[in-house]
């Protein structure tokens, strides 16, 4: 029997990263405020986890200004979408595994 645990991506072990990627998979782009509201986490938690996902190439970060107001938005990259899809598939296989 294949060990599906080994196919899970460690980048998505955190429930926060799992939440971030889940939101980004169904939205083209999400801004900081929306992500914070949806996940109910602190600014520091968002920044820390986004930074980790960005370093892996799974998330792109866009910073811009609307007038004088800064706006940061996030999107899943192609690599991020592929990695997250594989992670979800591994979870599904694990759930469907019979004894």
Show which residues each predicted segment covers.
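N-terminal helix-turn-helix DNA-binding core of bacterial DNA-binding proteins
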Residues: 3, 7-45, 66, 73
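Glycine-centered, phosphate/nucleic-acid-interacting loop/turn motifs that mediate DNA/RNA or nucleotide
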Residues: 57
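Short beta-strand "wing" residues that participate in macromolecule-binding interfaces
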Residues: 61
